[in-house]
Every structure is written in structure tokens, then in C-alpha cells.
């Protein structure tokens, strides 16, 4: 649970 969260937060 790190890569997905990172790219998701950035894509928000």
C-alpha cells in the first residue's frame, strides 16, 4: 500500500 496511494494522491 504505497505505490498505488502515491499515484492516486498525485492524480487527485
UniProtKB/Swiss-Prot annotation:
It comes from the Eukaryota. This is Unknown protein 6.
